[in-house]
Amino acid sequence: MPETESAFFPGGTAVSRLQVYDWAADDGLCGGSPHVHLACTEAYVVVGGSGALQTLTAQGLAEIPLRTGTVAWFGPGTIHRAINGDGALRVVVVMQNAGLPEAGDAVLTFPSDVLADPGAYAAAASLLDPGGSHASDENAAHRRRDLAISGFHRLAERIGAGDVSALTEFYRQALALRADRLDAWERLWRDGPSAAVARTGDHLAALRDGRVDHLLRAAAEVRHAPEPADRKFGMCGRLDTYELTPPSVKPAL
């Protein structure tokens, strides 16, 4: 009998279930911490409730309405903030490049002086895991959310006044915080998402040659939702995360 072959999760992506925070900020809006991904596209599939996604790019501040059934996605460099409009916003998050977000691909929009100091950033981020992005507890998640919103508003004001250099400065500070991880990120991408794409090329070549051996190695995999006590304090809200990365593709930061 042929040995089975572990299947990559579709597209080398990762999924999680998100309950957006319902804590009110100083501006009266409830929701999560504004942040940016440096290398990954993110998608929201709204499965309950309603709200909005605020985005900040070189084009300025924008707001995307979210309601059940909405699918929204945004590329690297899009600063984003999830707003819980009715207190019940729930989303399935699809992340490009499984492994990279878990390895710290996201950077919060803290004020510039905090971003300029790696130690200050790490302390303000209150990380559960130094290599990741989840907060250590609810109070820490609340504090860092408020600090990130203060930096977000400053960026939005400058960009709204036509000073796009504010965005460049933020990106450069974010890159400086993560520059020492780039080699590890590239390994994760090469061994995971890139390998998943390459495997499709191998399968197409086999089919073109009339070979079906790879189909005989097919297997199914499943992951179940974590226990409620194991839900993470993410940047946007409480997260149910799933370990979808093959064992051979793990961050070594």
Where are these regions (language model features)?
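Charge-dense, extended regions
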Residues: 216-253
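Conserved short histidine dyad/triad with adjacent acidic residue
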Residues: 2-4, 17-38
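Double-stranded beta-helix
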Residues: 86-163
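Short, conserved beta-strand element in jelly-roll/cupin
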Residues: 38-53, 96
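Extended alpha-helical scaffolds
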Residues: 131-202
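Short acidic-glycine-tyrosine-enriched beta hairpin
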Residues: 56-77
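Acidic/histidine-enriched, beta-strand-rich ligand/metal-binding domains
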Residues: 79, 83-87, 92, 97-107, ...
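Phosphorylation-prone, low-complexity intrinsically disordered regions
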Residues: 187-225
